[in-house]
A protein has these predicted regions:
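Helix-start/capping segments and mature chain N-termini
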Residues: 1-107, 136-229
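Non-catalytic, conformational "gating/processing" segments within enzyme and secreted inhibitor domains
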Residues: 110-114, 118-140, 155
């Protein structure tokens, strides 16, 4: 398939509307069949559970073009498993893991022209997510949900690609003991925004967070892996 006419080597890490996304809805205790759609907009009630009580979770993975022209993803089944854990922790209905993987395959195949070519340094970012959609007032789980997958071509997450970055030891905690740090809940990332904006303002690319219980052990960074040698 012919690729889109983009400057693949100079893509930033940002959103670009592509041709298709996957949507499935949960109502009356069951998921519908789901489908690929072309409309990128989401219309919700003003009192939707995602707005009022932050019932949302997401995943992130990538599709790559190999040297021989094939399109591949790395272990989407593990993302499906982690989303299952997130849903259970947030009292959201689990989207079946086999359907999760199938939906990823569908949306990547439908947007094959948006998967960056081999050697460009870019990838197709895949964002599965689930939100509470019906009106909820009073703290309780919603009754209706929507599972979606959007895709967008992206360049490296850090400007400049795979190069050394500056990291500071943050005064903020990334996750609370016995909290939601082990899942990919949207609320976790909202709480991290102030810390990363503050780090950038001081000239650092990223934070290194210490364990919140004792603040004596390294716990994680916000958006990168690290190895001590």
């Amino acid at each position: 398939m012919e690729k889109k006419n983009l400057d693949w080597g100079n893509l930033g890490f940002g959103y670009m509307t592509t041709d298709y996304r996957y949507v499935a809805n949960y109502k009356d205790g069951k998921w519908d069949d789901g489908a690929l759609v072309t409309d990128p907009t989401v219309t919700l009630n003003e009192c939707a559970g995602v707005f009022q009580y932050s019932q949302s979770c997401f995943e992130g993975l990538k599709a790559y073009t190999t040297e021989d022209g094939h399109i591949v993803c790395f272990r989407p089944d593990l993302n499906a498993s982690r989303m299952k854990d997130s849903c259970e922790r947030l009292e959201m209905p689990v989207f079946p893991e086999d359907r999760f993987v199938d939906a990823v395959e569908q949306v990547v195949k439908a947007n094959a022209a948006w998967v960056p070519p081999f050697g460009s340094g870019a990838t197709l970012y895949i964002r599965p997510y689930m939100i509470a959609t019906n009106a909820v007032i009073g703290v309780k789980p919603a009754d209706e949900y929507q599972f979606r997958i959007l895709v967008t071509p992206v360049g490296p997450y850090f400007k400049g690609g795979a190069k050394p970055i500056t990291i500071r030891v943050s005064d903020f905690d990334r996750a609370a003991p016995h909290g939601t740090g082990h899942i990919k809940a949207g609320l976790n990332y909202a709480m991290s925004l102030h810390a990363i904006v503050d780090a950038h303002a001081q000239g650092y690319a990223e934070n290194m967070y210490l364990d919140p219980a004792t603040r004596t052990y390294v716990e994680e960074t916000g958006g990168a892996n690290f190895i001590f040698i």
